[in-house]
């Protein structure tokens, strides 16, 4: 009898905890704003260390979960747009300047000084995004040059970069390119497995093994996929569960074909029953079922793997990222605006 009572009590307690957790609602809490920079680069190292990068050569860093921020203008790059950043700890980070010329810089002293590790003055060069797996292997992509998608990689933590040979680069269609919107149109995993989404007149998914069409809205330079999220259970191998978002940034309230999800690696794509509430520049898995997406007219949350999206904030953001090690989720956007997702 005593054993049965304990089992029943334990089951009731577990049910109460589950009901409490399901009742929690995500809320966007703005932490800081007012800086004259558009933030598109965001790297959340852990629950305390966050780096951001943006226009006017600006980089920001917090080491106390976003309570206070240190702002730095990179010396000699006052007008450069750093649209992506990858940070590894409170001292080490890499920033990507889009072009022309294109730059990649690295700091090892918390942003006090920066070393130029890559420069490309090729006409038409425009870097769009980069992604790292661990602290050594990384990949950067850029708009097509002579119809060949630009790709370079590093195996030493960004100290040196090796460009892919032209004959190994994927061929882009006329009017097909990438959006330097949030640094999340590329996802990299172990064994150099990658996922890249394009936009413009044609929108496709490029992987290390295939190229497939995307059903997202496309056909003009303002349309197409902006971001891809690939679910990973922690082994850094990725999975077949993916979500793609985008739309038309010239019609930021349009919900027409702005989001699709797949559970078979992109062989088939499904449209959400309730799509995000407009153009979205970034999407991020929070866990297997919960996702966050943001754009010019607000933030959406999905708790069923991307099948339905709830508009939880009308605050504008370019990018949202979850901590590499931890559970904290941050967002960044125009006018130096940075926010944190909290559960109420």
Question: Model segments located where?
Answer:
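Residue-level hotspots at or immediately adjacent to binding/recognition sites across diverse folds
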Residues: 24-344
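Bacterial Sec-dependent N-terminal signal peptides
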Residues: 1-27
């Amino acid at each position: 009898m005593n054993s049965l009572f304990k089992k029943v009590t334990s089951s009731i307690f577990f049910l109460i905890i589950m009901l409490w957790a399901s009742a929690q609602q995500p809320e966007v809490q703005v932490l800081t704003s007012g800086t004259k920079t558009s933030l598109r680069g965001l790297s959340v190292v852990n629950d305390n260390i966050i780096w951001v990068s943006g226009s006017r050569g600006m980089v920001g860093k917090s080491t106390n979960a976003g309570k206070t921020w240190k702002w730095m203008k990179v010396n000699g790059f006052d007008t450069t747009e750093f649209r992506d950043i990858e940070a590894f700890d409170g001292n080490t980070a890499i920033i990507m300047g889009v072009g022309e010329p294109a730059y990649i810089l690295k700091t090892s002293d918390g942003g006090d000084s920066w070393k130029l590790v890559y420069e490309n003055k090729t006409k038409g060069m425009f870097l769009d995004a980069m992604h790292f797996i661990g602290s050594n292997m990384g990949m950067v992509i850029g708009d097509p040059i002579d119809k060949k998608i630009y790709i370079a990689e590093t195996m030493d933590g960004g100290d040196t970069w090796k460009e892919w040979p032209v004959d190994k680069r994927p061929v882009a269609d006329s009017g097909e390119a990438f959006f330097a919107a949030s640094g999340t149109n590329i996802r990299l995993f172990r064994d150099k497995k990658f996922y890249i989404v394009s936009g413009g007149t044609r929108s496709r998914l490029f992987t290390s093994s295939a190229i497939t069409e995307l059903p997202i809205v496309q056909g003009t330079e303002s349309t197409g996929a902006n971001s891809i999220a690939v679910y990973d259970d922690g082994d850094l191998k990725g999975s077949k569960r993916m979500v793609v978002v985008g739309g038309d940034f010239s019609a930021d309230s349009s919900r027409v074909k702005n989001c699709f999800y797949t559970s078979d690696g992109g062989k088939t794509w499904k449209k959400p029953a309730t799509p995000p509430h407009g153009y979205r520049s970034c999407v991020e898995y929070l866990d297997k079922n919960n996702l966050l997406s943001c754009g010019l007219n607000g933030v959406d949350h999905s708790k069923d793997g991307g099948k339905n999206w709830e508009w939880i904030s009308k605050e504008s953001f370019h990018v949202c990222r979850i901590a590499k090690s931890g559970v904290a989720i941050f967002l960044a956007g125009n006018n130096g605006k940075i926010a944190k997702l909290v559960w109420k």
